[in-house]
Amino acid sequence: MLLKDKVFIITGASSGIGAAAADLFARNGAAVVLGARRERELATVADRIVASGGRAVPLPGDVTEAGYAEALVARAQSEFGGLDGAFNNAGRLGSGRMVAETPPEEWAEVLATNLTSACLTARAQLPALVARGGGSLIFTGSFIGHTATLPGMGCYAASKAGLVGLVQAIAVEYGAQGVRANALLPGGTMTAMAGDAATNPDAATFIAGLHALKRIARPEEIAKAALFLASDMASFVTGTAMLADGGNSICKV
């Protein structure tokens, strides 16, 4: 098991990539503290893990609040004795408006969820990792804002581009203390954030065609990439923006 006796926080864990990662990390021996806003769905994920013999506790809340980030760390320490890493996966897409039509409050909301929350969670998690002798932080980014973008993605692209810069800063500042930090950049993934692709076959076909593999990822596939970054298999990997995008970034046909 790649994460035997490790303790991880996973945010955005009520569905999609976060829920898949929660299941996968637990199957690989980790105790997981699960965060998300949707209390019922989050409890369902935690209950499923426990029923399968794993260790999981849910703590619902809003990642844009500094106190919540601190509470997640405190729960990891009180329930499982410490913290070895986190998959900071919570995210928000936005409404798809063009830049000139985007209300300032939407800009603020998207950046608060995708970028500011990453800083808040890192601030809370880093001292716990240093006290443990190091660990791994993973942040969900996107190919959007890194290698490509689409119309209507201004807020999202800016937030995800900024996230890569934050990850690099964390990697440089805390590497000597044993902390690794990486961004994981998925391509199109069949989650609620995929919008029409989840329910509209024509939209799904179009989005699949943007990828070299000509399909959309399953959440479990992205979770496997997160597991790699979380584990000692990636012991010399830090400060990266690792694409798991099915060739989206290179595909022009």
Could you tell me what each predicted segment is?
Residues L93-G96, L227, T238-V253:
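Short C-terminal tail/terminal secondary-structure segment
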Residues S14-S15:
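Conserved glycine-rich cofactor-binding loop
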Residues P127, V172-E173, S235:
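Alpha-helical segment proximal to the catalytic Tyr-Lys
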Residues A122, S159, V167:
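Active-site helix of classical SDR
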Residues G175, R180, V237-G239:
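Short, small/polar-rich loop/turn modules that mediate ligand/substrate recognition or access, typified
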